[in-house]
A protein has these predicted regions:
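Short, well-ordered alpha-helical scaffold segments within catalytic/effector domains
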Residues: 25, 29, 164-171, 195-196
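Active-site-proximal beta-alpha loop/turn segments in soluble metabolic enzymes
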Residues: 66, 156, 202
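Glycine/serine-rich phosphate-binding loop and adjoining beta1-alpha1 elements at the start
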Residues: 84-182
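A glycine-rich (often HGG/GG-containing) alpha/beta subdomain
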Residues: 1-110
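Gly/Ser/Thr-rich helix-start
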Residues: 8, 115, 193
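Glycine-rich phosphate/diphosphate-binding loop of Rossmann-like nucleotide-binding domains
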Residues: 171-224
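Solvent-exposed alpha-helical segments within well-ordered globular domains of core cellular machineries
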Residues: 33, 72, 99, 120-123, ...
């Protein structure tokens, strides 16, 4: 019986590869069902953000076989040859998988240590898997404990003190270079959560003009 975490992140892969392996939210229910079919049962949660794509799973089969099945699922689902993504994958088994989830949820493994978004992202991933009934008692207890540990870390340390996010740090850097953004034009690429956070940070700093570039005009208009 094994608990595993298989995935890649900003530590191990390029943004281009993470985008190829990304699971858009609307595809995750179908992906979870397909993964569960491939595993012949078991439990799984898919966490997919701009900085990481990870699958957490629990099954009666041994951890090595479980990782093999998850690897095969990722390649099949995204139609990407193993040679193009497997070298960037990490595989954590047993206690290592548990420790990895705790570090990720507490933002200790984030691009910006202490950022608050990851806790919500992990919670959303867990709730979506729960809605699809791909979570068992073991994964449920594991994730609930991870949420508790993450909140304890934020409460008992100053890891999240101040404005801690990639968006806020990027805007702070711009201010440190240009001093005043009132007469500046800034382009934001993408209208996802990161783009939205950046937009809010820029508006709070009094930026003069914002250009929003996005594949979908409709989504860009909603954010605008």
């Amino acid at each position: 019986m094994g608990v595993v975490a298989v995935g890649l992140s900003h530590h191990t892969s390029s943004l281009a590869l993470r985008e190829r392996l990304h699971f858009p939210p609307e595809t995750i229910p179908a992906a979870l069902r397909e993964l569960q079919n491939r595993l012949h049962g078991g439990a799984a949660v898919i966490l997919s953000t701009c900085n990481r794509v990870e699958i957490y799973a629990h099954h009666e089969k041994d951890a090595v076989a479980l990782c093999d099945d998850i690897r095969a699922f990722i390649g099949c689902w995204h139609r990407i040859p193993d040679s193009e993504f497997v070298p960037s994958l990490y595989e954590h088994k047993g206690p290592e998988a548990v420790g990895h989830l705790f570090r990720v949820t507490a933002s200790l493994d984030s691009l910006v240590v202490g950022e608050a978004q990851i806790l919500g992202q992990v919670h959303e991933a867990f709730m979506l898997a729960q809605d699809q009934q791909t979570v068992d008692k073991v994964l449920s207890a594991l994730f609930q404990r991870a949420f508790s540990v993450a909140k304890q870390v934020r409460t008992e340390t100053r890891i999240g003190a101040g404005k801690v996010s990639v968006a806020s740090i990027a805007v702070d850097l711009a201010v440190s270079i240009f001093i005043d953004l009132a007469d500046k034009t800034v382009m934001i690429v993408g209208s996802g959560k990161m783009g939205e956070s950046t937009l809010k940070s820029l508006l709070a700093r009094g930026v003069g003009r914002i250009l929003l570039v996005n594949r979908s005009a409709e989504k860009a208009l909603v954010l605008a």
